[in-house]
Amino acid sequence: MKKPQLRLGARGIVIREDGKIAIFNKSNKNEYKLPGGGLEGEEEPEKAFKREVLEETGCEVEIIECLGTTEEYKSLNNFKQISYVFVGKVLKDTKQLNVTEKEKDEGAKLLWETPEKALEIITKCYNELVASKYESVYAIKFVVLRDRKILEKWMEFNR
């Protein structure tokens, strides 16, 4: 068996002072997820998390906790992703998202919700997933399930 393509990522929970957390919606892709993305080159996971959060939420954050890692293996694509998972507290909100053209085309927008509402939205997304012109249900389910599990575990240990 061929060795899977490996991608390293950094993602997690971003909390405002009012207790609401960020969820990133790609409406044309039928996806709700926590902020985060791939590491660039030799980038450290903490720097990648802060960069991705700034791009996807417009917020500068302080990392207050490292929750660990997640590992996904997509056998149909022979693809493995390891994500470093953090909790970040908003220090400053620039109110300016810096998303890619692809993310704009996918309908990228930011929502701030209570953790309970965020979990409800992500769970509903997972349960009602449909394919889009961007991704198959197979690919999106990994993202949404991963982030649902991160949020569930964080809520379980922080409530």
Model-derived features: where do they sit?
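Local beta-strand/beta-hairpin segments that build beta-sheet-rich folds
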Residues: 67-68
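Conserved N-terminal beta-strand and adjoining loop/helix that marks the start
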Residues: 1-21
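Short loop/turn segments immediately following the C-termini of beta-strands
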Residues: 26
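A short gly/proline-enriched turn/hairpin at secondary-structure junctions
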Residues: 33-36
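Small-residue-enriched segments and motifs
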Residues: 10, 61-64
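Nudix hydrolase/Nudix homology domain
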Residues: 30-31, 103-159
